Amino acid sequence: NGDPKPVMVWMHGGGHRYGSGNYLMYDGTLLAKKEDVVVVSVSHRLNIFGYMHLADIGGDKWAESTNVGTQDLVAALQWVQDNIEEFGGDPDRVTIFGQSGGGGKTSSLMAVPSAAGLFHGAIAQSGSTIRGITSDTANAGVERYLNKLGIKANQLDRLQALTPQQIETTLYGAPAVQGFPMGPVIDGNFIPRHPWDPSAPSYSSEVPFMAGSTETEGGWIGPPPYELADVDMLESFRTALSNNNEQQAKELISLYQSKFPDRRNQMLWLTAAADNSARWNAQELNRLKYEQGSAPSYLYFFNWHSPVHDYRMGSYHTLEIPFVFNNVDVAASMTGADSYRYELAHVMSAAWAAFARTGDPNHVDMPTWAPFTTENYPTMMFGDEVMAVNDPNRVERLALAAIRQQA
């Protein structure tokens, strides 16, 4: 009823390998009802069915076989343009948003020429595609896979005689093809260049953008008791963050211990690892978007720690999703029963909806959220308190950047 509403198109996680838009946590009912938006969830071809690059070895017949998983997303966005008015949506106010692999999808779609004009805002949550898969890497993976199947380049039609189970079993059952590259391939056509390297994509220069991450992304991976011994922590910092330089690893550990004196070893490691991966990627996307000098971008950081498992998982990968969708009751196994979660869910879901409505996430129930600049790195912190902070991890960010430059 009334005026056409902003449209929010959700792209699920799973790293282009697995997942679905139908998970209960992604139910858009409350987001649509409370924030007066239309929510669309998308499922598409994944894994080897969505990202097997046959264009180079297969000739003309297979020329458009590349990136069909992402082509599905473009088709879905075109469907939204053609049909969303029938559902009360505004085709001129479409925002794509996604988490993990879904953040990779939104950031890569910004670099797809055929997607230009199909959306007007983009949000990447704990995921990004700064660089795509090169055609050489994709071709090498296909060759290993076809060799395992005993199929030659001029016999690609034989693939269509196989069952999906045979295709998957061969892929995952053969060490020779483990690590098969899955995701957007730089084919020179559908995706002409690396999405965000060396600069933000020009096709979406006028599209407002938001990106962020959670504080301890990997907290969902480690098994109980979620702890590391001192020697394990030193080894983790040395091999993963310090280019095998033990002195640098010790200096990083000291840096994080001084900032978080009450944190266990495991939580310190998870915080540093997330700073060096998902958080760095979100900051980098915002930097590149800012340097483009067109539409604004906004940086956030989710650092509310779940009480589940005695707070030992921290602010882990996927934890922000029920707050964005205002589904904290549906996801009580993730969020626990803290009453504050309702307040945080309101603030976050309203910010995401405000961004979809106007390209600006600000609303009356939160502090002023300034657009990103490289001078101040303004960041909206969603934690036990919602607050706007300039460059909250500056010291750690610069220390990790210095190590990166040595690699």
What is the role of each PLM region?
Residues 1-156, 173, 189-224, 275, ...:
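Serine-hydrolase-like catalytic core of hydrolytic proteins
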